[in-house]
Design a protein with these regions (language model features):
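A conserved ligand/cofactor-binding region detector
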Residues: 1-448
Length: 448
């Protein structure tokens, strides 16, 4: 694992603008809101060569981690190379205010060498060899199915749903995607990936505090490395980034709930799809909603356009019983509202193009290892999971955000499986909000 902080420098066109460090910016703007001096008078106290003394002169509240001040640092960029897919998932779950990107699965090395060591992850020593064996066999299954599906797509190009007049380079890319999108369920959740995030110092402090409070050695190691980079740009606010009792206790309870449910439901049999959608449209008696859903939606030119209050005030909660981790990694990045999963294996998804019986021994051994880790109460059971593991997943948000997600995740370029999940959620949504059907653009996940 390698963690790197990136420092922004102004472009040449901004050479004449006042210069501040992230925490100096927070101090200046905090003072700006607590005086009537005007910006020029405050900036006159700034010595960019000595930002710490400048902060002391302007406003020291930045020391105390006040949320209203810690968010004024602007975005701090951090890149994490070589973290497990699980840790990348967890960081996106925690860092809800961050802008970020993770390496696309198609660019990741699919090899047992591209996985952290058992020691780095905290896998119990006596189970390490079994875990390494599962990882190696899982990658072998991935490569075997990928090669078979790629050859099948060459022999039967209609399977790929190629656009008319597609150029050879596009044909090759879509064929490779066809194979990857179906073979990926054998990829270990422990596989290394990379991610980069940008968020304020305040939110970084919360993220690192949360990571430092988790029982996973990898998470705590990441917390220490991120903190070491943050100190270079935001030393005062980084003081508030250490493990804290409430975070540790909630993490302990979360793990206990996952272990209990995970052992009760552990299975490698695919779960039939179930979806649950709850729409809440009640309003305060003194602030009724008067706009129609049609009027809230019919002025949009695309999914990024503004929606009206009829959908923006509507609360929508939705959940699936069997979201494979492969799809969950994408849906987890929708930042609005709250997302929750116990991260268990209640079933195992394979597309119809793959015969489960051919991999029955691998999945039985993988499930046995997961059970052993769970029975020991080990948080490292997550590293025994493959991307085909199916877990319940819940997301609560507002109507406009749900509609955006449904249109995005069924639209062009969407993976066929999460398009299935969002289409099912849309059907349940339309049953409760039928007037939205004419205005929501449900896609067909055509390749791009």
């Amino acid at each position: 694992m390698k963690v790197t902080g990136l420092a922004l420098v102004p472009p040449p066109t901004a050479a004449d603008l006042p210069k501040v460090t992230p925490e100096l910016l927070a101090s200046v703007l905090a003072r700006y809101s607590r005086s009537n001096e005007g910006l020029d008078a405050i900036m006159a106290k700034v010595d960019i060569a000595n930002p710490e003394a400048s902060i002391d002169r302007i406003l020291k509240f930045v020391d105390y981690g006040h949320a209203s001040i810690g968010g004024l640092t602007g975005g701090l960029a951090i890149a994490l190379d070589g973290v497990s897919m699980w840790l990348a998932y967890k960081i996106f779950e925690i860092a809800q205010m961050a802008d970020g990107q993770e390496s696309s699965t198609r660019y990741i090395t699919m090899d047992a060498a591209n996985v952290p060591t058992a020691e780095q992850l905290g896998i119990p020593t006596d189970l390490a060899s079994r875990w390494r064996d599962i990882v190696s066999r899982s990658f072998a299954a991935y490569h075997a199915e990928y090669a078979r599906l790629d050859a099948l797509a060459v022999a039967q190009p209609d399977l790929v749903r190629l656009p008319p007049d597609a150029k050879p380079i596009v044909v090759t890319r879509l064929r490779k995607n066809y194979a990857l999108d179906r073979a990926r369920y054998f990829i270990p959740f422990a596989t290394r990936t990379n991610l980069g995030l940008v968020q304020t110092s305040r939110m970084w402090a919360v993220t690192v505090k949360h990571l430092d409070s988790l029982p996973h050695p990898e998470a705590r190691a990441a917390a220490a490395l991120i903190r070491a980079e943050l100190i270079k740009q935001s030393p005062r606010l980084t003081r508030h980034s250490f493990a804290e009792k409430s975070y540790e206790e909630q993490s302990r309870q979360d793990l206990a709930a996952s272990l209990s449910l995970g052992l009760a439901r552990l299975s490698s049999v695919p779960l039939a799809d179930e979806v649950w959608v709850q729409v809440e449209r009640t309003t305060a008696p003194f602030l009724a909603e008067t706009q129609s859903v049609a009027e809230a939606l019919n002025h949009r030119g695309n999914r990024y356009a503004q929606q009206g209050t009829a959908t923006r005030r509507m609360r929508v909660s939705f959940a699936w019983n069997n979201m494979a981790i492969a799809e969950l990694r994408d849906l987890n990045r929708h930042r609005t509202g709250h997302r929750y999963t116990p991260m268990i294996q209640a079933g195992f998804y394979l597309p119809h193009e793959i015969t489960p019986a051919a991999h029955a021994k691998l999945l039985a051994d993988q499930m046995a290892l997961t059970r052993e880790l769970m029975q020991r109460g080990s948080a490292t059971y997550v590293y025994s999971l493959l991307l085909g593991a199916q877990t319940p997943f819940e997301h609560s948000t507002h109507g406009d955000k749900f509609i955006y997600e449904a249109e995005l995740r069924t639209g062009m370029g969407a993976h066929f499986r999460y398009a299935d999940h969002l289409s099912a959620a849309l059907r349940a949504f339309f049953a409760q909000v039928p007037e939205a059907r004419a205005w929501v653009v449900e896609g067909t996940a055509e390749p791009e």
